[in-house]
A protein has these predicted regions:
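Flexible active-site lid/hinge loop adjacent to a nucleotide/diphosphate
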Residues: 1-52
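A conserved, hydrophobic alpha-helical segment in the catalytic core
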Residues: 1-9, 99-139
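Transmembrane helix-bundle segments that form internal channels/tunnels in multi-pass membrane proteins
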Residues: 40, 91-93, 104
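ATP-dependent carboxylate-amine ligase
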Residues: 58, 116-142, 146-308
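Short, polar loop motifs at secondary-structure junctions
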Residues: 41-45, 64-65, 278
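Residue-level signal for inorganic ion chemistry
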Residues: 5, 23, 38, 73, ...
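Extended acidic/charged loop-beta regions that coordinate divalent cations
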Residues: 1-14, 48-100, 133, 140-150
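Short gly/ser/thr-rich secondary-structure transition/capping motifs
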Residues: 18-22, 67, 138-140, 195
Length: 308
């Protein structure tokens, strides 16, 4: 079975793919030996994906608000820090409302992930009741982890988002969930690859951010200050931004700004710690250096109210 969720203009560098076309064609090869293909109709280049998937013996399609799909979701809604939606296509005699699904992870973009997982599970004979239990308890360490301060003034989201597609999904989802909240976004860009991210990421983040903090993120053999300056050079308009190379110090500064500068008395301030998730290693030079994970830093620092 081969599942195709999405395609973005990423992974193009001297050590990855030379062009987007090469990357896309490589990704489409997942269907070459698949008896069953699962395709998200919400992906870019969907016609080419469906053409490649047509070689499979069985094609299952999924999508959000795509009634033409084999399985599709409607009425996506936030329930606290979880997501609920109605699932259609399970059987011919289902109710018009469909099956109610609770997804125990934040981010409405995760509905597409869930639909692909549901389709794959159904294809191998797993029943919907077991699927519903699994999705309701689903958690990936460092993936859309929500940490809320005890006083409710700050909500931190820790996620592995690190490219244009994941940034677009995450930031738009956060804005829909917290439309009145100031947003502080902390991120960097990896060294030695995917040069285009240094232009794309600040441009994706800026429309949603009140402050961007650029910091160290797996620089490898590149100068991390150079990477951060290139990010800063691509900030559109006049979105406030700063560079703090030390990642722990940058996280500390983000929470300080959330407490002292970027405040809405009627809504929590959102702090986004992006790209590193629950990782405890940083790629520096030719080594992987131990660090405290973003998730650990969030839990440790979110309730600090006194700053130097």
């Amino acid at each position: 079975m081969a599942c195709f969720l999405n395609i973005g203009r990423d992974h193009i560098s001297p050590i990855e793919h030379p062009t987007f076309e090469d990357y896309f064609e490589s990704k489409l090869r997942i269907f070459d030996q698949a008896k069953t293909a699962v395709v998200n109709l919400g992906t870019e280049e969907v016609d080419r994906v469906l053409e490649a998937a047509s070689t499979a013996e069985r094609l299952v399609t999924v999508g959000v608000e795509h009634p033409e799909a084999s399985l599709w979701a409607s009425d996506v809604r936030m329930v606290g820090f979880s997501i609920e939606f109605n699932l259609h296509g399970l059987c011919a005699d289902e109710s018009e409302a469909g099956e109610k699904i609770l997804l125990g992870i934040a981010g409405d973009f995760n509905v597409e992930n869930a639909l692909v997982a549901i389709a794959a599970a159904r294809e191998i004979g797993i029943g919907i009741d077991a699927i519903k239990v699994g999705l309701s308890k689903f958690r990936v360490p460092g993936r859309m982890e929500v940490v809320e301060s005890k006083d409710g003034r700050v909500v931190c989201v820790v996620d592995y988002a690190h490219n244009q597609l994941s940034f677009r999904s995450l930031f738009s989802s956060v804005k829909r969930a917290f439309p009145a909240s100031p947003v502080i976004a902390l991120f960097g860009a990896a060294g030695g690859k995917a040069q285009e991210r240094r232009e794309q990421l600040p441009r994706e983040a800026a429309p949603y951010s009140d402050l961007m903090i650029f910091t160290n993120e797996d620089p490898a053999r590149e100068d991390p200050m150079k990477v951060c300056r290139e990010l800063a050079e691509n900030v559109p308009d006049d979105t406030p931004n700063k560079i703090i190379l030390d990642r722990e110090a940058a996280v500390h500064a983000a929470f300080k700004a959330a407490r002292e500068e970027y405040i809405n008395p009627d809504a929590p301030t959102i702090v986004l710690l992006l790209a590193k998730g629950d990782e405890e290693l940083m790629h520096v030079g030719d080594e992987f250096v131990p660090i405290e994970s973003d998730l650990s830093l969030a839990h440790r620092l979110i309730d600090v109210t006194q700053f130097d």
